Amino acid sequence: MILEGSYPYVHGGVSSWTHQYIQAMPDTRFVLWCIGAEAKSRGVYKYELLPNVDEVKEVFLDDAMRLKGRGRHLKFSDAEKGELKKLFEGEKPEWDVLFELFQEKKVNPVDMLMSPVFLDIIMQLCEERFAYLSFTDFFYNVRSMILPELYLITQEVPRADIYHATATGYSGILGSLAKWKYKKPFVLTEHGIYTREREEELLRAQWVLPYFKNQWINLFHLFSDCAYSHADAVTALFHRANEAQMELGCEKKKLRVTPNGVHIERFAGVRDKKEDGWTDIGAIVRIAKIKDIKTMIYAFAEVKREIGNVRLHIMGDVDDEEYYEACLTLIRQLGVEDIIFTGSVDVAEYIKKLDFIILTSISEGQPLSVLEAFAAGRACVTTDVGCCRELIEGDDGLGAAGICVPPMNKEQIAQAMIELCREPLERKRMGAVGRKRVEKYYTHDISMENYRRLYEEIRV
C-alpha cells in the first residue's frame, strides 16, 4: 500500500479506510510505503499496526531539502535532456526515461539541479516566460517544486505482488515507479480527485507567489498523468469522480467505481437519542481548512439565535493547529455557546448522544462520516461536494436521507440545520432511509469483495 499524508500518521477518512482494508484481508501480507511531509513524524503513529503488516517504509518530503550532492559532473543523453526539459517546462515527459535515469543510473537529484543542463534549461525558460521575475526567485521556485519529486524516484522500491496507491500525487509517482521497476500490477484508488483538491488549495494558498501558482498546479497535473498512464486499474468512489478522472486524461477502460463501505454491525445497537430537551448536532471531522469548520461555526451561530437548546459536537483530531486556534477565536468573537470539541472518539458510541450529523467540507470524495451516520440511523446535512448529493438523495427510490446544500453558504447550511432541529419526525424518517441505503449498497463486506475481485482480475 502506497500512502500519502494519511495512515498511519493521522486520523481521517482515508486512514480509517486503510486500517479497515488491511484488517479485512488477514491472509494478505502488507508493506506500507508511507509518504509524509516532515521527518519529525517518523515512527509517530495514530494507529496500532495490524499483525499482517510486515514493514513500514517511510519517506519524508522535507528530507529532500537536506539532501547533499556528490559533486559529480553529470552527462545526459539527448533523450534524457529532452525529457528533463519537458518536466521543467511543465510538459508531459516520458516518465520511464526519468525513472531509469534516477533509479538505474543513480543520478543524485541535487547534482542534477546544479548541472549546466538544468541551468541552461531554466535560464531559457525564465527569459521566455518569466522575464519580469528575478532569475533567483524562479530558480528556487523550480527547485522546490522538482526536488521532492526527484528525491522520491531515487528511493529503493519494496518488492510486492501488487502495488496499490491511494492518490495520484506523490504516492501515484511511487506506484508508477514500482510498476516500471518490477512489472507488477498497479492499482490506483482515489478517495477524492487529488489533482482538483491540490488545485483548489493552491489557488487559495498564501505561500505560493501568484505568478508561480500555475506552475505548481501543472506539476500536480503531471503527477496524475503519470499515475493514470501506469496504473492497470483506477478506482473511484462514485461515477462523477470517474468522469473527472477521464477529463484529467485517464483511459475509460481502466476506470472502476468501488464505493466505500461501513461496518454496519458496529452501529446495530444504536437507537434514537433519548429526549432531554436539547437537539444535539454532530460533526465527525478532523479540524482542517478543507473541512470548513469556520462556516460550520458561523451557521451554528445562526441556528443558536433561532433555537436555544441546541449543541454542536465536533468530533475529531486537530489536523491543523493554527486553523483550530482560528476557530476558537471565531467562537469567542461570535459569542456562541455550546460548541464542544471532543477530540477523537468512538463514533459508534458517541453518536448515541446525537440527533443528526453535519458536514460542511469544501471538498470530499465519499465521506465515511456520512456512511457512519446513516448506519446509525442519523440524517445528515452535507455540502454538495464529492458524492454527498448521491448519498443524500440516491437514485434508488428510497427517498432523501438528509439535506444537501451549497458549500461555504452559511445561510443555507443554517436553514437546513434549523429545519432538522424543528422536525424531529422528519429527521428520524430521513435517518431510517439512510440506514436502508447503507445496508443495501455501502457495507464494508461489499466494498472489500469488490477489491478482491479487482485484484484477481488484474493478476490474470
Where are these regions (language model features)?
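Short acidic alpha-helix that forms the nucleotide-activated donor recognition element
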Residues: 225-229, 343-354, 375, 393
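Carbohydrate-associated surface elements
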Residues: 240, 261
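Conserved donor-binding/catalytic core segment of Leloir-type glycosyltransferases
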Residues: 271-302, 313
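Nucleotide-activated donor-binding/catalytic signature segment of Leloir-type glycosyltransferases, i.e.
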Residues: 313, 324-344
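Aromatic "clamp/platform" in nucleotide-sugar-dependent glycosyltransferases that forms part
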Residues: 362
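Short hydrophobic beta-strand element within catalytic cores of glycosyltransferases
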Residues: 379-382, 386-393
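Conserved acidic donor-binding segment of nucleotide-sugar-dependent glycosyltransferases
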Residues: 398-410, 419-424
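A charged, aromatic-enriched C-terminal amphipathic alpha-helix characteristic of glycosyltransferases
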Residues: 425-456
